[in-house]
Amino acid sequence: MADLSTLARPYAKAAFDYANENGAVNEWEDFLFVAATVVNDKSFSTWLDNPAVSAEHKSAALVDLYDTQVASANDSAFKQLLDATKGVRPDSNASYPKVSVAFSNFVKQLSEQERLALLPEVYEHYRRHKAVSLKQLDAYVTSAYPLTDDQRDMLQARLAASLNASVVIHESVDASLLAGVTIKVGDKVIDDSMRGKLQQLKTQLTA
């Protein structure tokens, strides 16, 4: 059976294409973020897996949660989380529209096809579509040691040139790499670490 990421791709593309054509890219991103956050919650996911709950009830619950917790005047935890993700100041009193009919139908379709569990992956793929459309990509760089400013600038410049897009680098450190880096952009992974090279050598020697 295909993994969740593969199953989510067509839904994410359909969602982004519709949102892009209708000038609602940011709104759909907000809707998907909250829906994905809810689905990732263990207690709620257990409820979603309950066959006794109808598909219509499940999708309606997700929509109602957004409308009452985010698109209302209430200062809820969901709204605070969305504000933080978007870089909105807590005291800005940012307002969000209610869920659109189109998004409500999208969630309903996922629910009827027993695909609500895909929402976190749909959200991630949607964000990638948005980044590509803006010519901006996220590069997740893991290195054995913290990058210096010069190394970071050089890596960012090389990635931008090879990908023909502006690149936002997200850094993490993993001492087990021994040396070098691993880079993940979308579904592509570049392993230029010493650990990776040793693993390749081991594979070649035992082949």
Swiss-Prot record:
Pfam family, one: OSCP
InterPro entries per UniProt: ATP_synth_OSCP/delta_N_sf, ATPase_OSCP/d_CS, ATPase_OSCP/dsu
Subcellular location as annotated: Cell inner membrane
Example of a GO cellular component annotation carried by this entry: plasma membrane
Superkingdom per UniProt: Bacteria
Cystine crosslinks: none
UniProt entry keywords in alphabetical sequence: ATP synthesis, Cell inner membrane, Cell membrane, CF(1), Hydrogen ion transport, Ion transport, Membrane, Transport
The UniProt record lists the keyword Glycosyltransferase: no
UniProt main location, coarse: membrane
Topology class, membrane: Peripheral membrane protein
Family: Belongs to the ATPase delta chain family.
HAMAP family membership: ATP_synth_delta_bact (MF_01416)
Entry protein name: ATP synthase subunit delta
